[in-house]
Amino acid sequence: MDSILRQNPAANIVNMGDFNDNPTNKSIAEVLKATTKKRKVFKNKVLYNPMMTFYKQGVGTACHRDTWSVIDQIHVSAGLLKAGNTEWKFWKAGIYNKPFLITKKGRYKGYPFRSFSGGRFLGGYSDHFPV
């Protein structure tokens, strides 16, 4: 991505997936240079990370030992933030955690409703909420 942005600072880039790290981890904040500060995104050719907002609110995509993490993230380049971009534009990011995706009872109440646990099929969807 850095070489694309060097060649074309207005490139439309969406970087999304399970990064196995929170927005504050070194791999995201320092290596990817993903930030919530749009000014830095435009000036330094780095990525915007809208997922930090959820992390700061304690809302997550995955839960382990009662600690929520935002390891599933979306990052976008400055090209998608520019007001004049008429073809593609970043609108918003979110964590899709509707009731049917949430475990209703038991030890993992409130966690994402998993497909499998302990080798047993539970009928759920994933151990992460989609973004």
Where are these regions (language model features)?
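Metal-dependent phosphoester-hydrolase catalytic domains
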Residues: S3-V14, N20-V131
